[in-house]
Amino acid sequence: LYMEQALAGHGADAPPEQLWRILSSYAAFIEALGWELVARYYQRRLDSPDDASSMDPTRYTLRAMLDCLHQAEAQGILLPGQSVEWTADFFFRHFRGVVVDWVLHRGSYPLLPRLEQDYALFQNIFQV
């Protein structure tokens, strides 16, 4: 619900801005939860191998990212060579790693600026 509200009304934004909104909104959500709760969430996933094996394809955030990347592909601004699905999976794998690092550091640094630095590099996936 949080992500749906954060992304509402931004479907017409250009794909790079949509992707940044998805990632920054998710970072704000994760930070608001706090590192301890996020650590418990990941521990639960690790303790439930069936749950930890893959992303739920019906998850709103994943669908929003796929829609954004499909739009970028249709506009010819997504770099060729990788599928939209692989690219979305890459972003989630990377972001999960950033969140895990944040948890390992017990939330000692703000998550959003770290992600913003990474996104500046990732913008190169768009040919704009």
PLM-predicted stretches and their roles:
Residues 25-33, 94-101, 125-128:
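Phosphate/oxyanion-binding loops and surfaces in catalytic or ligand/nucleic-acid-binding neighborhoods
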Residues 2, 30-37, 44, 68, ...:
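A short secondary-structure junction motif
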Residues 4-33, 84-91:
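Hydrophobic alpha-helical connector segments
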